[in-house]
Amino acid sequence: MFKKVLVANRGEIACRVIRACKELGIQTVAIYNEIESTARHVKMADEAYMIGVNPLDTYLNAERIVDLALEVGAEAIHPGYGFLAENEHFARLCEEKGITFIGPHWKVIELMGDKARSKEVMKRAGVPTVPGSDGILKDVEEAKRIAKEIGYPVLLKASAGGGGRGIRICRNEEELVRNYENAYNEAVKAFGRGDLLLEKYIENPKHIEFQVLGDKYGNVIHLGERDCSIQRRNQKLVEIAPSLLLTPEQREYYGSLVVKAAKEIGYYSAGTMEFIADEKGNLYFIEMNTRIQVEHPVTEMITGVDIVKWQIRIAAGERLRYSQEDIRFNGYSIECRINAEDPKKGFAPSIGTIERYYVPGGFGIRVEHASSKGYEITPYYDSLIAKLIVWAPLWEVAVDRMRSALETYEISGVKTTIPLLINIMKDKDFRDGKFTTRYLEEHPHVFDYAEHRDKEDFVAFISAVIASYHGL
């Protein structure tokens, strides 16, 4: 096992990795910049080093991070998610410098990061894929020809995409021609190249993903699926495990396919295969994420498997201690992302200082966060404040527990997604499992909530009115 690990990330995921390392008896090294010198992950780590002043490139400075690991005697680097987590050049640099990258081999990251190549690999492994182009589109004329063959609507998306960028839905040829150039330009701006794919667009889809875990000796298991259909701007907001869509037979069938595919590409570490699902539960491969997912806790809650610890164990050369038969799915887990955003203003970021912060607790409730009173929400990073996770033996109980926990969670100073999430938990369609990736568009009433006023603010307001009235 490693003696020291450098965590090349920030926020809640850095705290999560540091906690896992501590439980394994591993010393931890945090990195930070000038504006995050008092951040929670910095305080939690055994050692912490400021490696930059500019908050925009601190966690993207691959060479400086690897050099620091060598300087302080860290044998491995955990990249978390985002930043350099799926950067094959960073993983390769670690290998070249003799540092263990806690994740899959850089060649696999490179392969699965290319949507066109990854789709070809999945096809060969027998995993269903969405009908569409076999590779990168040559031009808009080829896109028009394929769209005519498979029928509208179709989806244009960037081959190197992620985070919902470079994606366009086209319902006819006119929209396809117009969106082709827009998608191309967006892809160039976001990913450095404009390679586009075209696929059949599945109406009323669900977003289903399978968690896999493999070691360096060819052993691979799956930990079931998650439903991540409730999204804003193609980014996840609520995640559920297991899904309400798949039957046990479908779970076993698709689980065996993802395990087979992972073995064929030589995958080790934690990974997630993402699918789009139609109303009958047919799954079609979209992409593979070669890192820990934001939503991994819901899978941990229903399986009892600590995914982050196993990432570290596998990187250190340990064999998996589980067979597929050992994995049992117990109850239901829901995760809500608490973001510093204003849902009523198109989820615009809410910048400011957290003035009041109270976290819920109790049986079946888990909070992953790096926030506290006085925590500064800046424009430099993702708006995630915390992840609220609940578990219960029954779906209805899990939903009620999440609603209650959300109502108990107190954050002031910035707008958050909490009021919206409370309304989602109360919504009959959500409770009945009748939701797709279009849920928020089709349920505008969940945005209808009163702005919360803190008791202290209200008392101060009344006091000011009284003082003004009496001329005080």
UniProtKB/Swiss-Prot annotation:
PROSITE patterns in the record: ATP_GRASP, BC, CPSASE_1, CPSASE_2
Subunit structure of this chain's protein: Heterohexadecamer of 8 large subunits and 8 small subunits.
Organism encoding this protein: Hydrogenobacter thermophilus (strain DSM 6534 / IAM 12695 / TK-6)
Chain positions recorded as ATP binding sites: 115, 199
Entry annotated with the keyword Kinase: no
InterPro entries (alphabetical): ACC_Biotin_Carboxylase, Acetyl_CoA_COase_biotin_COase, ATP-grasp, BC-like_N, Biotin_carboxylation_dom, Biotin_COase_C, CbamoylP_synth_lsu-like_ATP-bd, PreATP-grasp_dom_sf
EC number(s) reported in the record: 6.4.1.7
Protein name according to UniProt: 2-oxoglutarate carboxylase small subunit
GO molecular function: 2-oxoglutarate carboxylase activity; ATP binding; metal ion binding
